Design a protein with these regions (language model features):
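A short beta-turn/loop motif at secondary-structure boundaries
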Residues: 36-39, 117, 198-200, 265-267
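Amphipathic alpha-helical segments
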Residues: 16-30, 98-105, 178-194, 254
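Aromatic-anchored, glycine/proline-accented short structural segments
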Residues: 156-214, 218
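Catalytic micro-motifs at enzyme active sites that drive phosphoryl/nucleotidyl and oxygen chemistry
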Residues: 32-35, 73-78, 111-112, 128
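Vicinal oxygen chelate
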Residues: 5-14, 44-50, 54-56, 66-165, 168-177, ...
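Short loop/beta submotifs within extracellular cysteine-rich repeat domains
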Residues: 67, 148, 216-217, 225
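An N-terminus-focused feature that recognizes amino-terminal "leader" regions
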Residues: 1-66, 287
């Protein structure tokens, strides 16, 4: 497998400050705004994890549209206009190996760049492949700093402490037109094996285990399926495991959000609460707990 883990998702937002305030109201602690050197982008993120593993949601915006076009970020501008999750980023250990694997499979790399902080320090190398075979927009990132060091630094900086106690990313989801062909592409090109199948609620789900989280590829089980008319591609959601679902739901309600009642989840022995959508920059946060 050339992918080591699901690193983060990118939520394209028009108003970085306003969107960040919504997530802070939700009970999540975000980093201070940071601009990327020689680019027109700025971000804030929230981390979920511990001293050995992490995942983050990146709120990404543009502070100079003309400069964004000059630097090839028209994809981000389109995503901002559309709203919701733009892309999921997967970590790779070796960017050169990833280039070779993609090239050997005939997959075009549409963006290949290094990313620096505003102070000039190197974040890492980013590859954005064409997405048709994979069913959703993905990117690959190889960091200059090790995961262990990043997690340790973020833990020491309090990045994992939130009023809303999310434990870990459980899964992301994407709706695809050809479930078997898309699953085969993830296996043959990216080295990700099918780890499970789930059926129910009008859906056929293939689970792809990437690190300690899952990417769900979803297709309808028939024309009358409730997901038959869903747009194809990455769903603008992320599911996080929590320990005490009722108390988390109460916290969300107390903060002025309108979470749905606790319901039985699609996954076996699971219960879920959902919040967000239009009230959260077109992003849906799913809280999930598992009965033993």
């Amino acid at each position: 497998m050339i992918l080591t883990r699901i690193d983060h998702v990118i939520l394209a937002v028009a108003d970085l400050d306003g969107s960040a305030q919504l997530f802070e109201q939700l009970g999540l602690s975000l980093t201070q705004p940071m601009r990327h050197k020689d680019a027109a982008t700025e971000n804030q993120v929230f981390f979920i994890g511990n001293e050995s593993s992490e995942f983050y949601v990146e709120l990404l915006s543009v502070h100079d549209r003309d400069r964004a076009l000059e630097t090839g970020r028209s994809d981000l501008l389109r995503a901002i206009d559309r709203g919701g999750l733009m892309r999921v980023m997967m970590e790779v250990d070796d960017a050169d190996e990833a280039r070779g694997k993609l090239g050997a499979a005939g997959v075009t790399i549409v963006q290949d760049r290094t990313v620096h902080r505003d102070d000039g320090s190197l974040i890492g190398e980013v590859l954005i492949p064409e997405t048709e075979l994979f069913g959703l927009d993905i990117g690959l990132i190889s960091y200059a700093e090790s995961l262990v060091n990043r997690c340790s630094r973020h833990a020491e900086g309090g990045r994992f402490r939130h009023r809303l106690p999310l434990l870990r990313l459980d899964h992301l989801a994407a709706f695809v037109s050809d479930l078997d062909a898309t699953t085969a592409a993830w296996r043959s090109i990216l080295g990700v094996e099918l780890s499970g199948r789930v059926e129910g609620h009008g859906m056929l789900i293939h689970q792809l285990q990437v690190g300690d989280a899952v990417l769900e590829l979803i297709a309808p089980d028939g024309l009358d399926s409730p997901v038959a008319t869903r747009p194809l591609g990455l769903a603008s959601m992320a599911a996080f495991e929590v320990e005490d679902l009722p108390s988390c739901r109460s916290l969300l309600a107390d903060q002025g959000f309108d979470p749905n009642p606790i319901t039985q989840g699609v996954l076996p022995n699971s219960e879920t609460v959902v919040v967000g959508g239009e009230k959260l920059s077109e992003f849906t946060l799913q809280l999930i707990s598992f009965r033993s």
